[in-house]
Amino acid sequence: MDCKITVMRKTWYKDLSEKYENPISHACDLEEGQVFISKGGQKPQGLCESAWESMRFFVETLASGGGNFYDGWMKNEKSAMISCNDGFRPVSFYIESIGEN
């Protein structure tokens, strides 16, 4: 089964970044509304590695027909809302299974 991964929201905690982070030359270039399709639980091209590592378990579970994470967490049992591990620039992703039910 395939999964649709949608960038829902991104933010930047500028105060934390200025206080704790070393300057970086390239920040996240994902855009709100951007969509990725995971085929059979595989990492979609163009999705950053950090984000993938945060959502991989959920995508693989949905792709194999599972769901209902944390006993009723999501209104749609075949979905999850996950954020990447970047504490300075977190990005929230909505993941949902598509295709076969």
Specify the residue positions occupied by each region the protein language model found.
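Short, low-complexity N-terminal intrinsically disordered segments enriched in polar/charged residues
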Residues: 1-2, 14
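Intrinsic-disorder/low-complexity, polar/charged segments enriched in Ser/Thr/Lys/Arg/Asp/Glu/Gln
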Residues: 2, 35-37, 90-92
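A short beta-strand micro-motif
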Residues: 3-10
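Short, structured beta-strand/loop micro-motifs enriched in basic residues and often containing a Trp
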Residues: 10-22
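Short loop/turn segments at secondary-structure transitions that flank enzyme active sites
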Residues: 11-13, 42-44, 101
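Short, flexible N-terminal segments of the mature chain
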Residues: 19-43
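Short, Lys/Arg- and Gly-enriched loop/turn segments at beta-strand edges
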Residues: 43-53
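Short, compact, well-ordered microdomains
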Residues: 55-101
